């Protein structure tokens, strides 16, 4: 949580007026996420963790606005893509939900954005320090590597943003993901 707050404070110092921000929101890396019961519609704590996810996204939105963001797009990128409590998001924020998406967790990104924020991110399957570590779908993938380097969902999505010339300006997630 401390790193998340520090990241938000840093973000508030980065931009001037009129910037456009893309937020990719995942759930496994939100504060307190430790079991599958918290992460899917059938889980007894799922509704509570939807609240946490939405709260972290709203904190990122608030920080981006404090730093001058005038347009924000949020991609609900966990599981079925229908996790954020959209009624609790600011009305002028655009949200991408559900699937299919040609760019996956980065659907909607293009070169018009000034920065990308990742919330709720987690480490890869290869990182044993991660609590909910996986890479995209652990039932289908155990590891993704590019030129011999292990890719996390975050590094993969950062590469997609980079393809459009958009920098990742903040990552919030579990300890293993943000190291």
PLM feature spans:
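A glycine-rich helix N-cap at a beta->alpha junction
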Residues: 91-109
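Active-site glycine-rich loop that binds ribose-phosphate moieties when present
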Residues: 138-164, 170-173
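Conserved mixed alpha/beta catalytic, RNA-binding, or beta-rich assembly cores of soluble enzyme
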Residues: 123-137, 145-149
């Amino acid at each position: 949580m401390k790193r998340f707050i520090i990241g938000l404070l840093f973000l508030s110092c980065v931009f001037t007026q009129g910037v456009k921000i893309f937020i990719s929101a995942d759930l496994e890396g939100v504060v307190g996420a430790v079991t599958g019961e918290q992460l899917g519609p059938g889980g007894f704590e799922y509704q509570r963790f939807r609240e946490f996810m939405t709260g972290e996204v709203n904190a990122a939105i608030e920080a981006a606005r404090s730093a001058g963001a005038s347009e924000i797009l949020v991609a609900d990128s966990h599981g079925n893509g229908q996790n954020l409590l959209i009624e609790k998001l600011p009305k002028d924020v655009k949200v991408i939900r559900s699937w299919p998406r040609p760019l996956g967790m980065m659907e909607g990104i293009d070169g018009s954005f000034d920065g990308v924020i990742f919330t709720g991110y987690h480490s890869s399957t290869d990182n044993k320090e991660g609590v909910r570590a996986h890479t995209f779908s652990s039932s289908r993938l155990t590891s993704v590597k590019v030129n011999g380097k292990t890719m996390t969902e975050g590094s993969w999505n950062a590469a997609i943003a980079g393809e459009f010339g958009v920098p990742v300006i903040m990552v919030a997630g579990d300890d293993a993901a943000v190291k």
